[in-house]
């Protein structure tokens, strides 16, 4: 039986991931030694192997204790908690930040609103590195929801942001819940435009394919 494989029109690296890979290669050439990234820069074995061939290795945060003063650590596109950057710097490590600019924007908005007394609500996956990192910019105090269950005891003064890869439908659903319950709301739709384009591309592909991965 003949099968045709169709590649989605907008498949490939997103801007943030490509930028992080480019930054890693740039810093390896600049420092001329191993570069350590906090977690894999990308979930693609071919690219991971290419990076390792160029002295760029993924480690877990717990492995940072075994690094030496002057070693170079790269923050990947997902970003990390503010405290992680401080801890790594305090260890004498050279920290280079390749957090996606869109994620950095969320982190700074969360930090500012938290300092202004807003309760932070993040729409996204509580176990995703990006969300874990964002939560760290408000002292790990955010309410995190994936929209599958209704929020309870929503505070009167809230700041709402989204994981960059969240579905627009989920964002709208959660925001509608919050609007009904809160009196003062600052909402930033921080879904990456590339995510929206890719989701629409997959929807179009599903109309002509029997199976979508």
Model-derived features: positions:
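The feature marks the mature, well-folded catalytic cores of soluble enzymes
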Residues: 1-212
């Amino acid at each position: 039986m003949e099968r045709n494989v169709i590649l989605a029109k907008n498949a490939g690296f997103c801007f943030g991931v490509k930028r992080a890979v480019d930054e890693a290669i740039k810093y390896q050439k600049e420092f001329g030694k191993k570069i350590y990234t906090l977690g894999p820069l990308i979930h693609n074995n071919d690219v991971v192997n290419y990076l390792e061939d160029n002295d760029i290795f993924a480690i877990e945060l717990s492995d940072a204790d075994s690094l030496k003063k002057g070693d170079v650590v790269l923050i990947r596109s997902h970003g990390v908690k503010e405290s992680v950057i401080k801890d790594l710097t305090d260890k004498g490590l050279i920290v280079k930040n390749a957090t996606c600019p869109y994620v950095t924007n969320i982190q700074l908005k969360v930090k500012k609103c938290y300092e202004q007394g807003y309760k932070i609500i993040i729409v996204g996956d509580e176990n995703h590195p990006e969300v874990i990192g964002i939560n760290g910019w408000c002292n790990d105090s955010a309410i995190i929801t994936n929209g599958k269950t209704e929020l309870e005891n929503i505070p009167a003064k809230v700041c709402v942001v989204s994981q960059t890869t969240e579905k627009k439908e989920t964002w709208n659903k959660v925001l509608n819940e919050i609007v009904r319950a809160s009196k003062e709301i600052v909402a930033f739709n921080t879904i990456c435009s590339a995510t929206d384009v890719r989701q629409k591309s997959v929807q179009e592909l599903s109309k002509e394919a029997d199976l979508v991965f």
